[in-house]
């Protein structure tokens, strides 16, 4: 009988972190670097001041914030130049804190749990990134949608 895979069998151990009180400008730079090179992750693991897991910040979180600003700019009555209002608001994003925009607050999975459980959570919640934590709530890895696809696709298509 084949042993079930655990999260620590498939998780990516090379991942980037950022403090919850960091500014989004710093987070954007880190995410951009992540996307361009290893670990090629769509986000960052967010840490509280004690170094414990606090959440994740993903490209989707940035896009949701931009969409919110876009709607606010378009809704301003009497504004013919919504684009100017939009970019004025965008300049303020950089000073926001990561904790104001991050998602996945406290949503994580344990390193010894079945990978199948992670797959279900990622697929059900439509997550891009799931943090893997140890018994002390310290992040030890990540599982991405891409990793789920890499692990499941061969079973489906071979």
Task: Enumerate the predicted regions with their spans.
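A glycine-centered beta-loop-beta connector
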Residues: 31, 38-61, 122, 130-147
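Extended, non-globular alpha-helical segments
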Residues: 1-2
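Glycine/small-residue-rich phosphate/adenosyl-binding loop
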Residues: 79-94
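The conserved cystathionine-beta-synthase
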Residues: 18-41, 47, 66, 90, ...
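A short, polar/charged loop-to-alpha-helix boundary motif
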Residues: 61-78, 148-158
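Extracellular/periplasmic ligand-binding regions of membrane signal-transduction receptors
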Residues: 13
């Amino acid at each position: 009988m084949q042993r079930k895979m655990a999260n620590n069998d498939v998780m990516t151990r090379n991942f980037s972190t950022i403090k919850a009180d960091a500014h989004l400008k710093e987070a954007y730079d880190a995410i951009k670097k992540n996307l361009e090179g290893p670990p090629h992750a769509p986000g960052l693991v967010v840490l509280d001041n004690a170094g414990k897991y606090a959440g994740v910040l993903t490209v989707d979180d940035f896009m949701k914030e931009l969409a919110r600003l876009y709607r606010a700019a378009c809704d301003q009555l009497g504004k013919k130049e919504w684009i100017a209002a939009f970019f004025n608001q965008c300049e303020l994003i950089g000073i926001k804190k990561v904790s104001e925009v991050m998602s996945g607050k406290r949503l994580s999975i344990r390193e010894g749990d079945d990978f199948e459980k992670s797959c279900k959570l990622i697929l059900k919640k439509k997550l891009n990134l799931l943090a893997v934590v140890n018994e002390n709530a310290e992040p030890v890895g990540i599982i991405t949608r891409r990793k789920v696809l890499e692990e499941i696709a061969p079973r489906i298509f071979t």
